[in-house]
Curated annotation (Swiss-Prot):
Official protein name in the record: UPF0178 protein BCE_3095
Pfam families registered for this protein in UniProt: DUF188
Cysteine pairs bridged by disulfides in the record: none
Origin superkingdom: Bacteria
Matches recorded under PANTHER family: UPF0178 PROTEIN YAII
Length: 146
C-alpha cells in the first residue's frame, strides 16, 4: 500500500504523515507549484509538484496510484476515478468514499453547480473542526492497519 494525498487544501496532512510514518507506509503529497515549500519531510514522505492548472494534481495521482493504494482527497471526481481503479479513498472529514455513496455525491455536486450557474447561491461546506480531524485520524488508522 502507498498513500497519495491531494495536498493543496488538505487539512490533515500532519495526521497522514505522522500515522503513515509510524506504520512505515510511503506517502506521496501531490500539490501545485503555488504551494511550494522547502520544508523537509520525514523519511518515506515525498512531495510531487504539478502545474497549477485545474485537476493537474488529480491526473498525477491517477497516473501513480495502483489498486489497493490509499488516496485522501476532497475531490469527488478524483474519488470516483480512484474507486474505479480499486483504490481506498478517504475524505479529510473522516468518511470513506464507496461505490455506494459516490454517485449521490457526484449528483449533489452537479445539482449545486446547476443552481450556481442559474445565478443562485448554494451553501458551502461546513468549517473543518477538531472533531472532524479526530474522526479522520480514527478512520485513517483503521485503513492503514488492514
Amino acid at each position: 500500500m502507498k498513500i497519495y494525498v491531494d495536498a493543496d487544501a488538505c487539512p490533515v496532512k500532519d495526521v497522514i504523515i505522522f500515522e503513515a510514518t509510524k506504520a512505515e507506509i510511503p506517502v506521496t503529497l501531490v500539490t501545485s507549484f503555488s504551494h511550494y515549500s522547502n520544508a523537509e519531510q520525514p523519511k518515506g514522505v515525498e512531495t510531487i509538484y504539478v502545474d497549477s492548472g485545474a485537476d493537474a494534481a488529480d491526473y498525477r495521482i491517477m497516473q501513480l496510484a495502483q489498486k489497493e493504494d490509499l488516496i485522501v482527497t476532497q475531490d469527488y471526481g478524483l474519488a470516483s476515478l480512484a474507486l474505479a481503479k480499486g483504490c481506498i479513498v478517504l475524505h479529510h472529514k473522516g468518511y470513506k468514499y464507496t461505490n455506494e455513496n459516490i454517485d449521490q455525491l457526484l449528483q449533489t455536486r452537479y445539482l449545486s453547480a446547476m443552481v450556481r450557474k442559474s445565478g443562485k447561491r448554494t451553501k458551502g461546506p461546513k468549517p473543518f473542526t477538531a472533531e472532524d480531524k479526530e474522526k479522520f485520524r480514527a478512520l485513517f488508522k483503521s485503513m492503514i492497519a488492514l
